[in-house]
Amino acid sequence: MRLPALLLAVLALAAAAPAAAADAARGQELYESRCGGCHSLDANRVGPAHRGVYGRKAGTAPNFSYSTAVKNATVVWQEKTLDAWLINPQALIPGQRMNFRVALPEDRADIIAYLRQQSGK
């Protein structure tokens, strides 16, 4: 009788445990391989520079020519908004120009952890 109760307790604790922490080092690798063709941390390319993006309002990076949709967006780049953006940019800000998605939740979490780290947050 004690074994089933112990098993239930262990399962309950496992279910309540937080998800694994995002890995910023892996996020850097993913960022460089998947995002680096259009973005960098410090220079605008096809897309805007990303250093300091976490916590910044969309469409406000200096010296980048944003679409009207992004300039007029009220989005602030944080965990949830960056995740939504990487899932489907067009759904978050219709009319924007980015046509790239990151399918796996763990990949998105790691990229976001890297961007947050590079923003000093």
Question: Where do the language-model regions lie?
Answer:
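Solvent-exposed, acidic/flexible segments
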Residues: A24, Q28, A43, V75, ...
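Sequence/structural segment immediately N-terminal to covalent heme-attachment motifs in c-type
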Residues: A22-R45, H50
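A generic structural signal for secondary-structure junctions
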Residues: A43, Y54-A58, I87, R116
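N-terminal signal peptide c-region/cleavage motif recognized by signal peptidases
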Residues: A14-A17, A22
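C-terminal capping alpha-helices of c-type cytochrome domains
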Residues: Q78-K121
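Bacterial N-terminal signal peptides
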Residues: P4-A15
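Short Fe-S-cluster ligation motifs
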Residues: N63-D83
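Short glycine/threonine-rich turn/loop motifs
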Residues: A24, P48-T68
